[in-house]
């Protein structure tokens, strides 16, 4: 579940939120030759996914507990940035990082279970 979502939220509302997030990303990357957070390279990650102290602590905990690789770390940041965009939040928040990490865990579980 995405942060702040209520069960039964109308699909039109979700579609509008996604459209706004995509427009925000298009504007963000207008000079970079990309369109989405998923396409960010390391330079753009550093620019657009800055973490405050609380978020850094959450990421350190996730790295130590989940044994994240640099690639997995980058993916979590990209997903957290996307969650922030869907929430129209300028900043990545700790709950967005935890949510993004939970998707990573679910991916691993699915691969192990159904792989």
Tell me the role of every PLM-derived stretch.
Residues 1-113:
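Basic, amphipathic alpha-helical bundle interface domains used for macromolecular binding and assembly
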